[in-house]
Swiss-Prot record:
Physiological role: Protein S19 forms a complex with S13 that binds strongly to the 16S ribosomal RNA.
Descriptive protein name: Small ribosomal subunit protein uS19
Matches recorded under PANTHER family: RIBOSOMAL PROTEIN S19P FAMILY MEMBER (PTHR11880), SMALL RIBOSOMAL SUBUNIT PROTEIN US19M (PTHR11880:SF8)
The keyword Disulfide bond is annotated on this UniProt entry: no
GO annotations of cellular component type: cytoplasm; small ribosomal subunit
MF GO annotations: rRNA binding; structural constituent of ribosome
Record GO biological process: ribosomal small subunit assembly; translation
Signal peptide: none
Keywords associated with the record: Ribonucleoprotein, Ribosomal protein, RNA-binding, rRNA-binding
Family under the similarity heading: Belongs to the universal ribosomal protein uS19 family.
InterPro entries: Ribosomal_uS19, Ribosomal_uS19_bac-type, Ribosomal_uS19_CS, Ribosomal_uS19_SF
Amino acid sequence: MARSLKKGPFVDEYIIKKVIAAKKAKDNKPIKTWSRRSTITPEMIGLTFNVHNGKSFIPVYVTEHHIGYKLGEFAPTRTFKGHRGSVQKKIGK
């Protein structure tokens, strides 16, 4: 279910403050965040966020195509190692 339009997108307040400060100072340093739930807004275009995936921080450079998505969508939390059977089939043939 989508968020109500009258409420607007959710963004943690400290991220908004850091984005405004980075734009004002024209700083290219990545913004470190644990807030995977925050929605990407147009003010964030051109900034880099280090998004925590539970183990490490993944750099996410925000472009215009990312608007409306959550920061966490670009920092995967799980690594897929492949299915066990597919490797054995290749070796057996």
